[in-house]
Amino acid sequence: MKSTSKLQEMKLKNITEIAESVGLSEDDIELYGKYKAKISLDVLKQKPRQREGKVILVTSINPTPYGEGKTTTAIGLSMAINRLGFKSIVTLREPSLGPYLGIKGGATGGGVAQVLPSTDINLHFTGDIHAVTSANNLLCAAIDNHIYHGNELNINPKAVMVKRAMDMNDRALRNIVIGLGDGQRGAVREDGFIISVASEVMAILCLSNDLEDLKERLGNILVGFSYDKKPIYAKDLKVHGAMALLLKDAIKPNLVQTSEATAAIIHGGPFANIAHGTNSIIAIKIAQKLSDYVVVEAGFGADLGAEKFVNIVSRKSGIYPSAAVMVVTTKALKYHGSMGAKENLTSENIDTLKKGFKNLEKHIENLKLLGLEAIVTLNRFPHDTPAEISEIESFCKERGVEFAVSEAYELGSEGALDLAQKVIEVASRKRKINFVYEDSDPVEEKIRKVAKTIYGAADVQFSKSALLGLELIKKLNIDHFPICMAKTQYSLSDDPKLLGRPKDFVLNVNEIRINNGAQFIVVICGDIMTMPGLSKDYAALHLDIDEDGNVVWV
């Protein structure tokens, strides 16, 4: 057995030193041991802004199943900006246990570009996801308890819209029946579980401005409908106050450190394929107060994380990126160029690599459409050849796009200095963010605009269920909400096998869900699951612990 981390013997700095390095006093933080802390919300309310706080958005092309290293690149970039004499904080999402124990492994970076203590962060961290799970499941318990004790609100059990949650990949819980037994176990009805980070409670946590806003949004969660088709909200069940209480610490961002002892803020964990895919507004705003450059990682490709950052996060918070880093790997380009072949992706193949440029080209175009200038960044692997790197650089130069190579995995900040310098240069230019759609557009029109503009779809096909959802949105008078597209991360389309830059395809909208508390509409496209399953050879089979408490990979 060997250690999973090159940094397990590194001596971490006390988190109070990290806090001090960005202008936070001991009164501004709440300690969770020596190396983790919560940041007080008073920092956002009372502390004067010390820095300019330009936001750098890190995104990618459509990834392979193993990811392309956005987190590693984001951490390396932030460390490199600090090395150049500026103040930078990287803000990331908290890893979910499901993917950590499933296919993807940890989400704390890699090599010598990590956030630490990585094992704690990847496992239970400060308990935020547990709190989200508890708040969600309190609401679910309250619904069934209300029905059991007389059902004063006349809730139709078949019209309940909130599902239970857990932070684990477990396909057996996607669809279940509850209340079975002798009649003393509540109403028998169909239910199901979603992974906690896909819950509306998680989205609300990341989009709230403060505790008061959090409580109000929780109260506005659309629980379901009565038998006479009246909407029922969480506030009608009078549990939104207790839900907010469960989240009173979870709403505070978490301060940790990078492998070069620079500050990192980790908070919230919404997936980008089934949610909006960015850490919390509170975390980013606090980081803006304390640094010159805030490096923000947006989940999956620019068709998901970056699109939603602009159309949901920027629209709601006024946080606008000054530059965008587009992470690519030779492996991902060849994956798209070979239309999904997983063999020989680490061998030089210039023709296949160049075929994959079509996917990169569309993502560069999308960032321009959103008003962002891209710095295409190759996350370099040992198998990358000079010829492959030269081809990518030439492709970018021909299109007037900045290009950099990041070797942060192997070299830390030293391997990302060129990237950092180019990011600072691009961020100095004034940009105007463009929204893909207007608030006033009908939801159907918003969907068509994203599908055609960002994905390149020829048309959109709505199922009967989706059409009913559109009608319900009009009845509830929430057409002004932004949309959160839920689709595969592997393709620009809703078909994970349709790689490269597909054209003339029809985007299939199968379902419309209303996240009334989070204030966005979830648009389910294709076969997308809100509760993942485990693969045959999942990561947990290879994880172990040694006698000193260190994680080992079997």
UniProtKB/Swiss-Prot annotation:
It comes from the Bacteria. GO terms for molecular function: ATP binding; formate-tetrahydrofolate ligase activity. It catalyses: (6S)-5,6,7,8-tetrahydrofolate + formate + ATP = (6R)-10-formyltetrahydrofolate + ADP + phosphate. Pfam families: FTHFS (PF01268). ATP binds at T64, P65, Y66, G67, E68, G69, K70, T71. Its EC number is 6.3.4.3. CDD domains: FTHFS (cd00477). Transmembrane segments: none annotated. SUPFAM superfamilies: P-loop containing nucleoside triphosphate hydrolases. Pathway: One-carbon metabolism; tetrahydrofolate interconversion. InterPro entries: Formate_THF_ligase, P-loop_NTPase. Signal peptide: none annotated. It is an enzyme of class 6 (ligase). Disulfide bonds: none annotated. Belongs to the formate--tetrahydrofolate ligase family. NCBIfam families: PRK13505.1 (NF010030). This is Formate--tetrahydrofolate ligase. It comes from Caldicellulosiruptor saccharolyticus (strain ATCC 43494 / DSM 8903 / Tp8T 6331). The gene is fhs.
